[in-house]
Amino acid sequence: MASSYRINCSTLLHLLMFLSSLLTSSANLSFNFYASSCSVAEFLVRNTVRSATSSDPTIPGKLLRLFFHDCFVQGCDASVLIQGNSTEKSDPGNASLGGFSVIDTAKNAIENLCPATVSCADIVALAARDAVEAAGGPVVEIPTGRRDGKESMAANVRPNIIDTDFTLDQMIDAFSSKGLSIQDLVVLSGAHTIGASHCNAFNGRFQRDSKGNFEVIDASLDNSYAETLMNKCSSSESSSLTVSNDPETSAVFDNQYYRNLETHKGLFQTDSALMEDNRTRTMVEELASDEESFFQRWSESFVKLSMVGVRVGEDGEIRRSCSSVN
């Protein structure tokens, strides 16, 4: 793994001022929330993520995606973890989510030392934060104190998650509904610098000809990259196959994603849309040329995402098991 990025002094000062402004509107969240009640909580989560990543380098991408799907559906309340026939986890839109065992391992480790103290919602947020660091990305400080949601409904999933064939306008609307800006959209899309996707998530960019062979129908794709994708996904077992989101540095959290967009190698239609539209192209080009800028902006946007729809106090609970309400 690449070594973790360290923020310089001026960037750190800027970030601290930014975080302070956010916390004024979420007074129940704070840094080191568990300092007195469970001082080892963040260490245990980080250690669990690092251990899991060392044996399975796909873990960081899975944890990031799990976090996005949790926050976008009902706020960052760990409702995506609840098992049941009609919960978020059971919805087809969440069928390919992973990383659940990492969350459970961290929760069990914490419960052994600090029973009924640390929320699953905080564990999911911290695990996603630590996943980025484990993959070589920036170290981000996030506030904690979230409570776990008490309900989880499959019906809430499809209206809230972003499909890979969304237009830019649809993505902007989705992010805006969560209090996130167009800059947050471009920056958080950088999560696609790690992780993988099943073929059916992007096969709408191709069609089969009269002989049953794939042909490109999305002119925004680089020809050689499109050929690679079609070859990978042409077999009858393509529904179970996965392709790296980033064809260049798939296990490293860096700004390669944006450089891929410049060469028309975005895996999803939603990726390519960022480079094709004047409203976002300049940001893509800036982040492609300056990894430090990407890491700074990632830190800011990630914290904003982690505070979407959080539950605090009596609005939530501390689950004993992340997969079921108390």
UniProtKB/Swiss-Prot annotation:
GO CC field: extracellular region
GO biological process, one term: hydrogen peroxide catabolic process
Binding site for Ca(2+) 1: D70, V73, G75, D77, S79
Cofactor binding, per record: Binds 1 heme b (iron(II)-protoporphyrin IX) group per subunit.
Binding site for heme b: H192
Stretch forming the signal peptide: 1-27
Top-level EC class as recorded in UniProt: oxidoreductase
GO MF entries: heme binding; lactoperoxidase activity; metal ion binding
Assigned EC number: 1.11.1.7
Disulfide bridge map: C38-C114, C71-C76, C120-C322, C199-C233
Main location (coarse class): secreted
Residue numbers marked as site, Transition state stabilizer: R65
Catalytic reaction annotation: 2 a phenolic donor + H2O2 = 2 a phenolic radical donor + 2 H2O
Active site: H69 (proton acceptor)
PROSITE patterns: PEROXIDASE_1, PEROXIDASE_4
Domain of life, source organism: Eukaryota
Annotated keywords: Calcium, Disulfide bond, Glycoprotein, Heme, Hydrogen peroxide, Iron, Metal-binding, Oxidoreductase, Peroxidase, Secreted, Signal
SUPFAM superfamilies found in the cross-reference section: Heme-dependent peroxidases (SSF48113)
Subcellular location: Secreted
Functional note: Removal of H(2)O(2), oxidation of toxic reductants, biosynthesis and degradation of lignin, suberization, auxin catabolism, response to environmental stresses such as wounding, pathogen attack and oxidative stress. These functions might be dependent on each isozyme/isoform in each plant tissue.
Note: There are 73 peroxidase genes in A.thaliana.
PANTHER family noted in UniProt: PEROXIDASE 6 (PTHR31517:SF17), PTHR31517
Family per similarity comment: Belongs to the peroxidase family. Classical plant (class III) peroxidase subfamily.
Protein name, UniProt field: Peroxidase 46
Recorded name of the encoding gene: PER46
